[in-house]
Regions:
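C-terminal accessory extensions appended to soluble enzyme cores
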Residues: 235-415
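Conserved Radical SAM active-site core
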Residues: 1-148, 156-158, 180, 367-415
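Conserved AdoMet/S-adenosylmethionine-binding subsite of the radical SAM
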Residues: 66-269
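Generic serine detector
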Residues: 8, 12, 19, 28-31, ...
Length: 415
């Protein structure tokens, strides 16, 4: 029997490297149809495939969410400590909370009223624009200085955007919305130039950054497009990508990636683009952040989604460790362990809500660990894919152990 309500929040699968690992979605589906959407690849396989592809949708239970945040000790479960510590919650991970479903159902609006009442810090990720012209929403947003809004825009090319981002307002409309938020005296507007796609983003990316800055964006976050070559959904979209990019995208990624399966372009390909972005952000007065594992050391601080260092995000993650090492040359486990132990030390890895624990090998290895134990294991096993060493491809180097046998990492990148 299908569940009446969608179950959210969940833990991000990038928990080891995420400043907002508690991520929330209003709906089980998204009315937008972006060809690059990783959620589409993730949800469009296995048992949920039919309901996702047919755009069947369920919303969260507003009453359940209110109980979680009103009495976290009783109703918060694994998220109780995160809520009690009032860490920033990421809203909009797998779906857009301001999409067409919200326009007809209004579940996000109900929750916004509640979160404003309790003054809870939030970071939104969206491509929608209509809510910035709706007084019901803007009356709640105005003056709410602990609500930050990220607007995803990957190109100024209206035609390419229309083809790739089906059902999404034009880049200009999104810039207009960003400007309305920037002028609302809230927690800031951020340009989310993700995913950055060579051939689609490259012709206009510097103009896009300048335009966002002129509209009031105070930060930008970026990440290169990754190709999941095992995804049948993405394979079906490849002819469209090839036409828009002007080259064989899959062949390009296979040639310039060092991995197989999930293809990420190598550092040399990305370097000139990231350096151009950072230089321009410094010129126009925007903070710069890289969510990509490559060149994350260029971030202004330890929240790669673009939150300033004054915000109450989790410091228990590798991006923070990278910033510490960049400043002090070395970083130690005790430098980041407090938030890890407080926020994710109270539940077992195997039971982490929304986290990928399906691998039999991982189950056997981590079955008895808490999530905090798992993160410490990653820290101390540099050959693991999510270790600081492997994730950043040697920018953090293990150089020894402390008195507790935890690895010490040294910064190995540009200052």
């Amino acid at each position: 029997m299908p569940q009446k309500y969608y179950q959210s929040p969940r833990w991000s699968n990038e928990i080891a490297d995420c400043s907002m690992p508690m991520t929330f979605d209003t709906y089980s589906n998204c009315s937008f149809g972006c060809l690059y959407c990783f959620s589409q690849f993730q949800r469009g396989i296995g048992n949920p495939k039919e309901t996702y592809l047919h755009k069947d949708v369920r919303g969260v239970s507003v009453d359940r969410v209110k109980k979680m945040f009103t009495d976290p000790d009783k109703y918060g479960g694994q998220f109780a400590e995160y809520i009690k510590q009032r860490k920033v919650m990421q809203w909009g991970g797998l779906s857009d909370q301001f999409d067409g479903f919200e326009r007809t159902r209004g579940v996000t609006l109900e929750l916004l009223r509640f979160f404003k009442e309790i003054n809870y810090p939030l970071c939104f990720s969206t491509k929608a624009t209509w809510f910035t012209k709706d007084d019901r929403y803007m009356d709640l947003i105005r003056g709410q200085r602990n609500w930050n809004f990220k607007f995803s825009i990957i190109t100024l090319d209206e035609q390419k955007a229309h083809i790739i981002e089906k059902g999404v307002p034009s880049p200009k409309e999104r810039l207009d919305a960003l400007e309305r938020i920037a002028n609302a005296d809230a927690g800031g507007a951020t340009l989310r130039l993700r995913p950055f796609i060579i051939g689609v983003s490259t012709p206009t990316y510097l103009d896009l950054i300048r335009e966002a800055a002129s509209r009031g964006a105070t930060a930008m976050s970026t990440e290169f497009f990754c190709v999941e070559q095992r995804s049948p959904t993405l394979k079906a979209f490849m002819p469209t990508f090839n036409e828009l990019c002007g080259f064989d995208v899959m062949a390009f990624y296979r040639k310039y990636s060092i991995s197989s399966g999930y293809l990420r372009l190598n550092r040399k390909v990305k370097e000139p683009f990231f350096k151009n972005m950072k230089a321009l952000c410094e010129e126009v007065g925007m903070r710069f952040y890289v969510s990509d594992a490559h060149f994350k050391e260029l971030c202004c601080n330890g929240s790669c989604c673009g939150l300033p260092s004054s915000w109450n995000y989790s410091r228990g993650q590798w991006c923070e460790a990278l910033q510490i090492a960049k400043e002090k040359e070395f970083v130690y486990w005790p430098d980041i362990k407090d938030d890890i132990e407080k926020l994710v030390g109270g539940f077992e890895w195997i039971r982490a809500i929304g986290f990928n624990t399906n691998s039999s090998e991982k189950k056997a290895k981590f079955d008895t660990m808490t999530m905090a134990d798992y993160m410490r294991w990653l820290w101390n096993n540099p050959q693991a894919g999510q270790s600081p060493y492997k994730l950043f491809e040697g920018i953090l180097l293990p150089v020894g152990k402390d008195e507790n046998e935890d690895l010490i990492y040294k910064y190995n990148g540009h200052k």
